[in-house]
């Protein structure tokens, strides 16, 4: 598959979610993982594969539910230790995986925020993915749709419904609304 979600079962997902809600780095992080060259062979040299994975961490780390001493400072040591935890998750489900890894590139929440100021505290969701920021409440009550009070300005970022992680969803919503508005202007001249 091009993209897989990695967790043993719903109970493990529930535990990881509870750990995140308490501000703890999950002992067994839930992963979204993919292989670029499965859908685009030009993304990796012939005979090789490029894999990526991401997980969620608390916006404010209060502790580590794993057997480590991670604090959320995301020093090089902490980034490497958490990446190892992620690799161990994959290794448990795909024995031999770690022996195939030739290199890795780690983007911590702080690095994400440096690369894109829209990613508040490094969140790909443009903020939080908690319930109070979903559906009609995203990004704030009254702006839960792509339309804004500014004519021909539409919300299309991870901060808009349905949020980050629904890759392309906010942009598709905004494009649909913009195209419909354009058609109405052509037909009705308004």
Where are the regions that the model predicts?
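C-terminal structured subdomain/cap of oxidoreductase catalytic cores
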Residues: 48, 74, 78-86, 124-190
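Acidic/polar loop patches that form or flank catalytic/metal-binding clefts of enzymes
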Residues: 1-2, 96-102, 184-189
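A glycine-rich dinucleotide-binding beta-alpha-beta segment and adjacent secondary-structure elements
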Residues: 26-32, 92-161
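Conserved FAD/dinucleotide-binding core of flavoprotein oxidoreductases
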Residues: 45-85
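Short conserved micro-motifs at the rims of enzyme active sites and ligand-binding pockets
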Residues: 1, 16-17, 43-46, 62-67, ...
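Short, glycine-/Ser/Thr-/acidic-enriched flexible segments
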Residues: 9-12, 36-40, 58-60, 129-131, ...
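Mid-domain catalytic core of redox enzymes
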Residues: 1-44
């Amino acid at each position: 598959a091009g993209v897989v979600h990695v967790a043993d079962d719903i109970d493990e997902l529930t535990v990881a979610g509870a750990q995140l809600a308490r501000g703890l780095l999950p002992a067994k992080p839930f992963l979204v993982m993919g292989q670029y060259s499965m859908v685009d062979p030009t993304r990796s040299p012939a005979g090789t594969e490029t894999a990526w994975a991401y997980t969620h961490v608390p916006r404010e780390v209060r502790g580590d539910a794993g057997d480590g001493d991670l604090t959320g400072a995301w020093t090089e040591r902490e980034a490497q230790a958490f990446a190892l935890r992620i690799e161990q998750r994959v290794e448990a489900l795909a024995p031999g995986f770690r022996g195939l890894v030739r290199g890795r590139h780690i983007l911590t929440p702080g690095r994400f925020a440096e690369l894109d100021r829209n990613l508040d505290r490094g969140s790909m969701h443009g903020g939080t993915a908690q319930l109070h920021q979903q559906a009609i409440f995203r990004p704030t009550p009254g702006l839960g749709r792509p339309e804004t009070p500014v004519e021909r300005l539409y919300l299309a970022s991870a901060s808009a419904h349905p949020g980050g992680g629904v890759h392309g969803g906010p942009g598709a919503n905004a494009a649909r609304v913009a195209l419909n508005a354009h058609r109405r202007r052509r037909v009705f001249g308004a």
